[in-house]
């Protein structure tokens, strides 16, 4: 089988169409064209053509992978998954990854270090969440253990406290005890240990005093009483107390406040 002509592709000047015996047969990257010294008049066997096609697949996949990496650093697993989606053959994926490693495009340790530092500085995620994400990205336990040590106890408490302040602002209608429980639970879900979560919760709510809680209780009582005014006094009172207890206020605190402020439900008849 003889190459009868070679033409440059109109949409990609770095790729060439190869015609064998006057018919289009395949296309190759410029690097593959030069490596196999493809030129008009050259005779190729079927085995040689298959070898050229495989080499071109690797070259094409390598170009795609480098472009994929141009947006941000990736783990080896992320690149492998990307190449699979590009319908690359397994042999090509393995060869591409080897070439990328040789070119220093892949380094899972550096990737894990950079990813961890970025998450610590920009997302306020807890260490367990970051560990889980690194596992999903294909990092080994050894690498994960190594890089997560960079997340110091001091940084964890600082970030957890910042998260706690945000949670507190979104839940400023609850009693202090309930608020602390809410903050602790949310922080654990965000990847912090229970010890760090509790410490951050206490730190964030430290400046809430009795006056603040009394003010919150007053507003909640007024709101709940308006909501329950359609009920008879005894039912309205019970519903109000139940609602307030669900927000973390103790029964004794509610009763004391109602008594001290002479709040009566009789007026709602």
UniProtKB/Swiss-Prot annotation:
Signal peptide: none
InterPro entries: RecX_HTH_1st (IPR053926), RecX_HTH_2nd (IPR053924), RecX_HTH_3rd (IPR053925), Regulatory_RecX (IPR003783), WH-like_DNA-bd_sf (IPR036388)
Keywords for this protein: Cytoplasm
Compartmental location: Cytoplasm
One Pfam short name: RecX_HTH2
Residue pairs linked by disulfide bridges in the UniProt entry: none
GO biological process: regulation of DNA repair
Gene Ontology cellular-component terms listed: cytoplasm
Coiled coil: none
Record function comment: Modulates RecA activity.
Family affiliation: Belongs to the RecX family.
Protein name: Regulatory protein RecX
């Amino acid at each position: 089988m003889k190459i009868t002509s070679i033409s440059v592709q109109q949409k990609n000047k770095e790729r060439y169409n190869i015609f064998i015996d006057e018919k289009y047969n395949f296309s190759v990257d410029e690097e593959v064209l030069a490596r196999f010294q493809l030129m008009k008049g050259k005779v190729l066997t079927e085995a040689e053509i298959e070898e050229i096609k495989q080499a071109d697949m690797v070259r094409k996949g390598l170009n795609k992978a480098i472009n994929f990496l141009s947006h941000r650093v990736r783990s080896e697993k992320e690149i492998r998954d990307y190449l699979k989606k590009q319908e690359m053959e397994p042999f090509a994926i393995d060869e591409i990854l080897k070439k990328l490693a040789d070119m220093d495009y892949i380094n899972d340790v550096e990737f894990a270090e950079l990813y961890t530092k970025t998450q610590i500085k920009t997302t306020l995620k807890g260490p367990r969440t970051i560990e889980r994400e690194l596992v999903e990205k294909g990092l080994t336990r050894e690498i994960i253990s190594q890089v997560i040590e960079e997340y110091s106890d001091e940084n964890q408490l600082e970030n957890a406290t910042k998260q706690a302040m945000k949670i507190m602002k979104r839940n400023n209608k609850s009693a202090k005890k309930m608020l602390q429980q809410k903050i602790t639970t949310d922080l654990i879900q965000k990847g912090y240990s229970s010890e760090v979560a509790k410490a951050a919760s206490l730190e964030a709510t430290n400046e809430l005093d009795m006056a603040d809680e009394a003010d919150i209780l007053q507003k909640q009582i007024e709101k709940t009483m308006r909501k329950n005014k359609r009920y008879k006094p005894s039912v309205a009172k019970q519903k109000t107390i139940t609602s307030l207890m669900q927000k973390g206020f103790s029964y004794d605190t509610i009763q004391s406040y109602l008594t001290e402020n002479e709040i009566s439900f009789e007026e709602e008849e």
